[in-house]
């Protein structure tokens, strides 16, 4: 009875309002996009670039135009560009799933950069140095950093829940709709366009480029940093020997970095070519033989594995010639009581329990997360003047824990298929249907999250026609997963990005 009286009271109030006041009242109750504009400068190649930064949100709506999510972004546009509507624009995001775009924005390609040691040492406590980033891509492209729903300040609205966004295809749809809305709102349809994803962001990108091109939005280039496109190549599961083969060159590179090899190879690239050849031919053949592998053959393979990784021959035999990433990280420097990082094995720290064969904590994250968390919270409030009552979620573990890994591949009229999730067919379709699309692939030698040789394997699985294979540009760096954590690698990445954007924009027409 009380609820009915309240409802009647509200109806009477609304009836008493003039029509325009009633409309305004309804509109004010609906979520709306908001943004804050600031201005800054960045010096790149000795040239001062003036830019406009816009930190804000766009509202995603369902088919009934009901608001379902508020998506936060930070966009940087170069000021004074001739024919600004035709200037290149790059949409950038990190991975997870469940990560905000803080890493790329504050560490890699944004105009400001939080300074961390290049030598993989733990970052000291605050205050942190947030400086001019001479390796930003603003010299070549405007850039929009996007926080997927559930990360950063982005969140579901109304009755919508994370389940509607936290999945391979759900994520592609929401990110795709954001990009379409952004391009329409800010009149960038005629701009050369790029997608740039890191880690799981590369997986997202391979499906997203196909989704957007199916909506009629053509792209000039796709940029992948630390790629995972087919989880069969990186999932250590019973019956799947592929990761053992594809991770081996990274084990060798990491052992080389930590001087765990005897003799110590002088040239890493030449050394890795030998390891790759061994992995493809001798090692893979040995694993395929299973129990039929002779003891003599097993000894020969174990000896070679020991030579290439620094782990003892007896350790490899005990492991049945199969050492997963967790085991390698804890075994390599175990005599010193140290473990290496997963995403960047240059990072080392003490093992909490040296008897365990798996990491108890993320070594790289423990070294850098504090700096990035503090820096982005300070930067958003003090430099961009964006204030929110919500916490900025650098990483949201709930997203990854509740992620729907099913994916409907292109050219299939029915739903997702069982097995390892794979978006290689999506990227292949995007490159074939848009034969001008350029692909840039970047990988770090010391990355055990997305190993460089696994990346090469999946890119080769695109099976592109010979002419389109010329559109694939692959680069390797002497660093781990986050290529920008080492300044020389970041400088090389910047050089390669500049060249790639030029190639992609200035194609023959």
Residue ranges and their predicted role:
Residues 7-21:
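Bacterial N-terminal signal peptides
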Residues 25-26, 65-166:
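N-terminal cap/lid subdomain of alpha/beta-hydrolase-fold enzymes
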Residues 111-116, 212-309:
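A catalytic-pocket lid/entrance helix-loop region that shapes and gates access to the active site
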Residues 188-199:
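Alpha/beta-hydrolase fold nucleophile elbow
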Residues 197-210:
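Glycine-rich nucleophile elbow surrounding the catalytic serine of serine-hydrolase chemistry
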Residues 291-443, 448-449:
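Alpha/beta-hydrolase fold catalytic core
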Residues 437, 451-461:
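Short alpha-helix in the alpha/beta-hydrolase fold that links the catalytic acid
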Residues 478-489:
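Catalytic histidine-centered segment of alpha/beta-hydrolase-like enzymes
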């Amino acid at each position: 009875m009380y609820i009915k009286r309240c409802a009647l009271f509200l109806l009477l109030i609304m009836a008493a309002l003039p029509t325009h006041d009633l409309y305004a009242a309804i509109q004010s109750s609906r979520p709306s996009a908001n943004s804050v504009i600031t201005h800054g400068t960045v010096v790149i190649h000795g040239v001062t670039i003036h830019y406009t930064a816009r930190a804000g949100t766009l509202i995603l709506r369902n088919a009934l135009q009901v608001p379902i999510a508020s998506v936060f972004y930070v966009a940087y546009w170069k000021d004074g560009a001739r024919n600004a509507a035709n200037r290149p624009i790059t949409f950038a995001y990190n991975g997870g799933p469940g990560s905000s775009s803080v890493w790329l924005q504050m560490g890699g390609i944004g105009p400001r950069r939080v300074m961390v040691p290049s030598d993989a040492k733990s970052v000291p406590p605050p205050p942190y140095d947030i400086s001019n980033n001479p390796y930003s891509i603003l010299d070549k492209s405007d850039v929009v950093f996007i926080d997927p729903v559930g990360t950063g300040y982005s969140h579901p609205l109304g009755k919508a829940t994370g389940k509607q966004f936290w999945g391979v295809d759900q994520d592609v749809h929401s990110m795709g709709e954001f990009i379409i809305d952004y391009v329409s709102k800010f009149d960038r349809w005629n701009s050369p366009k790029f997608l740039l994803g890191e880690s799981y962001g590369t997986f997202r990108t391979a499906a997203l480029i196909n989704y957007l091109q199916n909506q009629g939005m053509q792209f000039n280039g796709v940029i992948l940093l630390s790629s995972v496109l087919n989880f069969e190549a990186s999932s250590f599961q019973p019956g799947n020997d592929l990761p053992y083969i594809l991770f081996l060159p990274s084990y060798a590179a990491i052992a080389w970095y930590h001087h765990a090899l005897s003799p110590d190879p002088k040239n890493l690239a030449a050394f890795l070519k030998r390891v790759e050849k061994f992995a493809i031919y001798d090692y893979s053949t040995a694993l395929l033989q299973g129990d039929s592998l002779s003891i003599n053959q097993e000894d020969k393979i174990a000896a070679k594995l020991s030579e290439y990784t620094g782990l003892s021959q007896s350790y490899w035999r005990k492991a049945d010639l199969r050492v997963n990433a967790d085991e390698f990280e804890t075994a390599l420097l175990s005599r010193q009581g140290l473990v290496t990082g997963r995403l960047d094995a240059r990072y080392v720290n003490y093992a909490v329990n040296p008897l365990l064969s798996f990491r108890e904590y993320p070594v790289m994250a423990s070294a850098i997360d504090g700096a990035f968390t503090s820096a982005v919270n300070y930067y958003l409030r003090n430099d961009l003047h964006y204030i929110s009552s919500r916490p900025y979620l650098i990483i949201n573990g709930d997203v990854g824990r509740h992620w729907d890994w099913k994916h409907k591949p292109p050219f299939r009229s029915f739903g997702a298929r069982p097995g390892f999730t794979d978006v290689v067919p999506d990227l292949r379709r995007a490159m074939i249907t848009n034969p001008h699309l350029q692909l840039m692939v970047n990988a770090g030698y010391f990355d055990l999250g997305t190993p460089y040789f696994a990346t090469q394997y999946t890119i080769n699985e695109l099976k592109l026609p010979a002419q389109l294979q010329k559109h694939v540009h692959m680069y390797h760096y002497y660093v781990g997963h986050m290529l920008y954590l080492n300044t020389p690698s970041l400088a090389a990445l910047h050089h390669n990005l500049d060249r790639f954007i030029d190639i992609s924009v200035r194609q023959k027409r």
